[in-house]
């Protein structure tokens, strides 16, 4: 059972090493500069508490980590959010996400947002190599079978274990079912 820590009450130290879950990066890099009013808008605490904690971690000299899979998950979330914003601003539009990708100006905006977010993540944290070989599947499958993690989070946890990283910054209560040592969160459902 992981130890749960409040990001508001934690003081990071130089030796700390944190893996940052994708949604935290999303709120830190993309949402921080936008007012999003879709059905899936971030909550105020997500936009305030996680960026504040990331800044505290960086100020302490502690290390932040991500992996290349964060890019695919983040790109999908940003595209979905931009699509939702487009649909809300254009209620007469009856397009799906694939058709949305064909709108040149919207595609450029999405790609610009993804590029900016990814550059920021790489500027602030270390990208861990991920080996997605067939021999890794059984351990990931075991994590999926014994926790409530989704496949991305199971891969992240497997990578953290491989790299000896025991701390994760996340809003996701599924990590409570995992073997990660320490969860850092602002989510009151977990605390």
Label for each model-derived stretch:
Residues 1-70, 77-93:
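Short, well-structured N-terminal submotif of metal-dependent ribonuclease cores
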Residues 1-17, 157-191:
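Acidic, PIN/NYN-like endoribonuclease modules and their adjacent C-terminal/linker elements
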Residues 24-26, 70-73, 174-176, 190:
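Short, solvent-exposed loop/turn segments at secondary-structure junctions
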Residues 21-23, 153, 172:
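Acidic active-site catalytic centers that drive phospho-/nucleotidyl reactions
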Residues 2-3, 13, 111-167:
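Active-site neighborhoods of divalent-metal-dependent phosphate/nucleic-acid chemistry enzymes
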Residues 72, 133-139, 189-191:
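A short acidic, often aromatic-flanked loop/helix-cap motif at beta-alpha or helix-coil junctions
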Residues 56, 69, 81-88, 99-133:
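Low-complexity, serine/threonine/proline-enriched polar segments
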